[in-house]
């Protein structure tokens, strides 16, 4: 896989709360230079990114119910519609982790479906399951519910919890959802070796702030 092909699999990400206008402008400039799949940013930065990336192939990705997933499904649905209206092409939503652990699967599925329905095929939907907080059984169940709810992707992590993507989790997620859905590895992918390991195990997208280091064959100390 060459640098260009790898770049097209990366969501160039900045989700830290202190990200200012200059940070978003820099992120978008880099995304255009490397032709990354998207920029992944917080909802308040969607309008600016959409303006900066207009006419390019780089998509605008934002996050919903982030990073805890503890908002109500009504709030997540509103966030989704609002983000799309402001220019988002992709939305990465966080599941309600507590409800999953309660085995309230009906709630978890409805929560995901609220975002899928709000997106109304106008934006790709990615479901963050926060693998570091789940048992193997819970990871499988979360992926099954995301698939049942009609989401486009499952995603490992927010990058704000206790761990990120591992090749083992990617393999399990890919085996669970099958070949039709996307699988996004995020959190802790900091080098070309990390990227190759998750791709080998079934990742079709990578979320990283270390995107340039990955493409240039370097190693970043970034946490996302």
From Swiss-Prot:
Q: Which GO BP annotation is one of this protein's?
A: carbohydrate catabolic process
MF term (GO), any: deoxyribose-phosphate aldolase activity
Manganese keyword on record: no
What is annotated as the active site? Answer: 92, 155, 184
Extract the CDD domains matched here: DeoC
Superkingdom of source: Bacteria
Any single GO CC term annotated in Swiss-Prot or TrEMBL for this entry: cytoplasm
EC code(s) of this entry? 4.1.2.4
- SMART domains per record: DeoC (SM01133)
**Transferase is among the record's keywords:** no
Catalytic reaction equation(s)? 2-deoxy-D-ribose 5-phosphate = D-glyceraldehyde 3-phosphate + acetaldehyde
Spell out the coiled coil positions from the record. Answer: none
Q: Which PANTHER family match?
A: DEOXYRIBOSE-PHOSPHATE ALDOLASE
Q: Which family is it part of? A: Belongs to the DeoC/FbaB aldolase family. DeoC type 1 subfamily.
**Name of the protein in question:** Deoxyribose-phosphate aldolase
């Amino acid at each position: 896989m060459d640098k260009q092909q790898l770049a097209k699999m990366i969501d160039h990400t900045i989700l830290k709360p202190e990200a200012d206008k200059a940070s978003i402008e820099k992120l978008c400039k880099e995304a255009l230079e490397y032709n990354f799949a998207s920029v992944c940013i917080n909802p308040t930065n969607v309008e600016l990114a959409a303006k900066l990336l207009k006419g390019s192939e780089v998509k605008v990705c934002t996050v919903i119910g982030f990073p805890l997933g503890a908002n109500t499904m009504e709030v997540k649905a509103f966030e989704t519609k609002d983000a799309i209206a402001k220019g988002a092409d992709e939305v990465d939503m966080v599941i309600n982790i507590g409800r999953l652990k309660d085995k309230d699967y009906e709630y978890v599925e409805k929560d995901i479906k609220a975002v899928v329905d709000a997106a109304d095929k106008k934006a790709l939907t990615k479901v963050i399951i926060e693998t570091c907080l789940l048992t193997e059984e819970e990871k499988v169940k979360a992926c099954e519910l995301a698939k049942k709810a009609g989401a486009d992707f499952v995603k490992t992590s927010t990058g704000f919890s206790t761990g990120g993507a591992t090749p083992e989790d990617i393999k399990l997620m890919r085996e669970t959802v099958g070949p039709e859905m996307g699988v996004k590895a995020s959190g802790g992918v900091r080098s070309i070796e990390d990227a190759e390991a998750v791709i080998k195990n079934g990742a079709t997208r990578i979320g990283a702030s270390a995107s340039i280091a990955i493409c240039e064959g370097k190693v970043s100390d970034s946490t996302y």
